[in-house]
Amino acid sequence: MISPDAARNVVGIIGNVISFGLFLAPVPTFWRICKRKDVEEFKADPYLATLLNCMLWVFYGIPVVHPNSILVVTINGIGLLVEGTYLLIFFLYSPNKKRLRMCAVLGVELVFMLAVILGVLLGAHTHEKRSMIVGILCVFFGSIMYFSPLTIMGKVIKTKSVEYMPFFLSLVCFLNGVCWTAYALIRFDIYVTIPNGLGALFGAIQLILYACYYRTTPKKTKAAKDVEMPSVVVSGTGAAAAAGGGNTGGGSISVTVER
């Protein structure tokens, strides 16, 4: 019989693979930006928000905050590189006004992270307190971002069209939420359960809406169906013992598509 830790380890690895794949979801959008050398109406906000979440989870996973959480650091470290690349492309092809706004938001995020790091390391002196404080921040910001699909779901209901809510992305996001919720429930972890439970719930609602409205969606439209990623959240807490005593990290991603 497989042990709970081994089962959780397997689920965690699957979740990390899905999380990495979803980090790459906006590639078509940025390929379009590079080809046209223009960001058009796309916004940097989702990628700036994801960058902050990745920074928080990387900090959460380092040994001085939550020991033996290597997969938390690796998946979110990869996320930092991916989101940083997206933002660099966005910066290169944005007008000066958007560039200034990006720099301002990024500056605020860096100041916030510095405050969190100093506050946690100097004010909390045990791993339990440090992981609790940073974990709560991660859950708070991650849960807020999970409400972004409400906009596109409202649009689907209003237009009776799922044109801008692709089935594949909705399905993968649902499976990702279910995967990490199962991971969290094997050995209950509140920090992973809350955001991923929301992810599974909203993913299920999107699939239900797709089933209801895909027949009424126009088969051909003039608008390009470019994939924008308003919110992508990768979260994790070390909990399952990996080989050699390490723990795996959880991940949750919400992907919605906007015109």
From Swiss-Prot:
Residues on Extracellular side: 1-9, 67-69, 125-131, 187-189
Residue ranges that the UniProt entry lists as topological domain Cytoplasmic: 31-45, 91-103, 153-165, 211-259
Transmembrane feature ranges: 10-30, 46-66, 70-90, 104-124, 132-152, 166-186, 190-210
Membrane topology (UniProt): Multi-pass membrane protein
Location of the MtN3/slv domain: 10-98, 133-216
Compartment(s): Cell membrane
GO (cellular component) term, any one: plasma membrane
Entry keyword Transmembrane helix: yes
Keywords from the named record: Cell membrane, Membrane, Repeat, Sugar transport, Transmembrane, Transmembrane helix, Transport
Domain of life: Eukaryota
The keyword Transport is annotated on this UniProt entry: yes
An example molecular function term from Gene Ontology annotations: sugar transmembrane transporter activity
Function (record text): Mediates both low-affinity uptake and efflux of sugar across the plasma membrane.
Family membership noted in the UniProt record: Belongs to the SWEET sugar transporter family.
Summary of subunit composition and partner proteins: Forms homooligomers and/or heterooligomers.
Annotated protein name in UniProt: Bidirectional sugar transporter SWEET6a
Species lineage: Eukaryota, Viridiplantae, Streptophyta, Embryophyta, Tracheophyta
